[in-house]
Amino acid sequence: MRKATIERKTGETQISLTFAVDGEGQSNLTTGVPFMTHMLDLFTKHGHFNLTIDAKGDTEVDDHHTTEDLGICLGLALKEALADKKGIRRYGSAFVPMDETLAQVVVDLSNRPHLEFRADMPSEKVGTFDTELVHEFLWKLALEARMNLHVIVHYGENTHHIIEAIFKALARALDEATTIDPRVKGVPSTKGML
């Protein structure tokens, strides 16, 4: 099973995260950031991953450090779980509608980190969660997973729907990109490595 555990402890957060690429959509999440718990739960379900998180952070300040470090840890776990990336499809894309919203996510597990984020958030907050943290989480995820990640929201009015559609599309795109393709011999690159 392609799986990794990451332990991260700083002056701001303490996180233990276990991620399995080949899962059943099961999650056991304690993040201290309820909205991120919700998003990571549906990410796990729609990507058919398994994810366990035990996180404590300085949420009395705000959710920034915990959300950022969750992205770091998930990115590191994805990179470690995929190891040399032999046999994977490498690319994945998904469109996900949620009511009035349509989100698109495209990924390339290229070892070349980049985030292209084209999503306007109508509201600065969903509940107590700062919506600008979605970009922060995704950038740290892309950076640490060494993934090229494009997020495009074609339209949408409800901020919760926009963010939820992004996370579901991310899950489906990563599920596709991490799938082992029996036609792929070795690493999916003409360079012979990623």
UniProtKB/Swiss-Prot annotation:
Q: Which Pfam families does the record match to this protein?
A: IGPD
Catalyses which reaction?
D-erythro-1-(imidazol-4-yl)glycerol 3-phosphate = 3-(imidazol-4-yl)-2-oxopropyl phosphate + H2O
Which processes are annotated in GO (biological process)?
L-histidine biosynthetic process
Which family, according to UniProt? Belongs to the imidazoleglycerol-phosphate dehydratase family.
Q: Could you say which EC number(s) this protein's record lists? A: 4.2.1.19
The pathway to which it is assigned is: Amino-acid biosynthesis; L-histidine biosynthesis; L-histidine from 5-phospho-alpha-D-ribose 1-diphosphate: step 6/9
Q: Which PROSITE patterns does this UniProt record tie to the protein?
A: IGP_DEHYDRATASE_1, IGP_DEHYDRATASE_2
Task: Report the locations given in the UniProt record.
Answer: Cytoplasm
Keyword list, A-Z:
Amino-acid biosynthesis, Cytoplasm, Histidine biosynthesis, Lyase
- Species of the source: Halalkalibacterium halodurans (strain ATCC BAA-125 / DSM 18197 / FERM 7344 / JCM 9153 / C-125) (Bacillus halodurans)
Q: Carries keyword Transcription regulation?
A: no
A GO MF label: imidazoleglycerol-phosphate dehydratase activity
Q: State the protein's name.
A: Imidazoleglycerol-phosphate dehydratase
Top enzyme class of this protein?
lyase
GO CC annotation, single: cytoplasm
Keyword Amino-acid biosynthesis applies: yes
